[in-house]
Amino acid sequence: MEKDLFMKVKCFVNQRDFSCNVFVCSDDKGAFIVDLGYYDSEIKKYLSSLPELKFVLQTHGHFDHIMGLDSFSKDFPDVPVYIHEQEVDVALNPTNNGSMGMLYSPVSLQITFKTLKEGMCRLCDYDFKVIHTPGHTKGSCMFFFKDQKILFTGDTIIETSIGRTDLPTGDEAALFRSLEKFKKISFDDDVEVCFGHGTSFSYKELMKHNSFLR
């Protein structure tokens, strides 16, 4: 019997603060989240309609991508949250996560992260590749679900542009090295590319319209 590789990706956008995308992915095996930048009753209600929620993946630790984690963890205390091993101190430090001076109340998370490294990863029957792309932050990552043809880029690549490097742990030279690394990876044209901000589109469209990747 052929394995069902269909995965539904629903995007919630934080319209109040910095328009960060929250991706809720689900299939017949369960569900997971990529970048919990906010958490409200709408997201909670949607999660309750899905199969078992397995885990949360964080592409990086900037405040606009992590602001929902503490509230979420109170409702789902047993759901682990994963982030690159070099990004833990970015997420947990209000200066490094960019919230100090940017928000009225700095983001000081009380959760405990589980860590990821570069390479293939298997979590709860989901196989994906962790692509370490430092530059926007030192532990920024992309997550590529090859079988489902979905790529999450975080803020390393955003539609027709790339992430900023003027925040703590940002490194312009490292970002451009990460872009060169990305260009050497083979993706099918119909892979859906999901950015940390903005509208998702295909890998073919990304390579056509993003001049930083030529």
Regions found by a protein language model. Give the residues of each.
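Conserved beta-strand hairpin/beta-sheet module of binuclear metal-dependent hydrolase folds
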Residues: 2-46, 142-154, 158
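Short Pro/Gly-enriched beta-strand edge/turn motifs at strand-loop
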Residues: 3-9, 101-102, 124-126
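Short, well-ordered beta-strand micro-motif
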Residues: 24-26, 53, 122, 144, ...
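Short catalytic-loop micro-motif centered on adjacent basic/acidic residues
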Residues: 31-34, 55-57, 130-132
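Active-site HxH/HxHxD metal-binding segment of metal-dependent hydrolases
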Residues: 38-122, 212
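Metallo-beta-lactamase
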Residues: 127-213
